[in-house]
Amino acid sequence: MNFYLDNNIVIVNFNNSLKDDFFIFFNNIYKEITDKNIIIDFGEKNIFSSSFLDKLINISTSHQNLNLSFVIVSSILNSESIPQSLVWSPTLKEAKDLIEMDEMQRDLGL
C-alpha cells in the first residue's frame, strides 16, 4: 500500500495487501492525513466483507465529522452492494469530482 497527496486530497492505493493489513497501514498514516480529504482506491479488489465495510463506515463517519470528504473507489461495487453511509465511486476521476462538489457545498455553507 502507498499514499500520495494530489492537491488537497490524499489518495491511498490498496495494492495486493491483505485486507487486515489495510487497517494497520491506514491507522499508522491517519494522523498525518487527518486534515485532508481522503480517497481510498481499492481498484478491482473484492475484499468487502460486512466487517470490513463496518470498519470503513466508522472511519468515514469520523472523518466526515471533521468536515472533510472520505470516498472509496472500487470498480466491482455498485450502489446496491454498499451501505449508503459510505461515499463510493467506480473511478478515481469521479471520486475527485465528488470531493470537489463537497468542497463547493462546504464553501457555500450547505
Question: Could you tell me what each predicted segment is?
Answer:
Residues 4-6, 31-35, 63-65:
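Flexible, charged surface loops at secondary-structure boundaries
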Residues 1-27, 44:
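STAS-typified acidic loop motif
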Residues 87-95:
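Short acidic-hydrophobic, aromatic-tinged amphipathic segments that line or gate anion-handling sites
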Residues 53-59:
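Charged helix-capping and loop-helix junction motifs
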Residues 23-53:
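Short, glycine-/small-residue-enriched flexible loop/hinge segments at domain edges that mediate gating
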Residues 94-110:
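A charged, well-structured terminal subsegment
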Residues 12-14, 38-43, 72-73:
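Conserved beta-strand segments of the P-loop GTPase G domain that flank and frequently precede/overlap
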Residues 60-82:
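Short aromatic-glycine-(Arg/Gly/Cys) micro-motifs in beta-strand/loop hairpins
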